[in-house]
Amino acid sequence: MEEFRKEIVFESQNLERETKLTIFGSYGFILLAFPLVGDEYDEQVDCRFVEGVSDYIKNGIFRIVYVPTIENRIWKNGDKSLEERSGLHFKYNSFLVDEVLPKIFKMAGSPTPIITFGCGESGYFAGNSFFRHPDLFYGTILIDAFFDIRRLCGDYFDTNCYFNSPLDFLPKLEEEYWLIHLRTRKHIYLCVDEKDGFSVSQATQLSQILNNKSIKHTFEKYNISSENKFDIWSHIFFDIVKRYF
């Protein structure tokens, strides 16, 4: 896939460092992917997901754009207080909306549909980004994700944490502007390995909330005979892409 790969390197004002977007493909809608390990695209892990859908990329169905995340640099940074980490998460949201999306639209030549994607902890960032901004994103593919920010912040919980915790803010969401966007999105996928009790519980809670809000979505449990998380996640990802795209 190297012939379809390019990078956009830039200085982020919100993250206060140089960062980059890793892009595969030249045409189609955008699959905004959050790295599975670490905060950056990983050649050994993330590449298997790219290779597995290479035909879709080559045929211009979609492009995959890997965006940096903040799990390790911010939430697992013991040198900063939890209040500071929460504040940096706020800046990360601004980074996505004010810096990443304009660069993606410029690359595409116009505003283009964007679906977020992530597994495990990266699934939290993919899901949170979508549910916070359903007016900007067209859907999300979430595999073994969690939706309660307490998984990152522990007992610390401020207003910013609340608005970055879908299991907390979605039940109380009443504004029609956001609900209309959520109810018209056709690509919301909650997928779990049924052997992962925590992920099943998180997805079940979120699915119940979405049902209560009349938000259509697909909730699927998989039984895959493997103990390797990356094998399980890639199997589920390929299945969703094959069946729905």
PLM region spans:
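Non-catalytic cap/lid and distal C-terminal segments of serine-dependent acyl enzymes
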Residues: 1-245
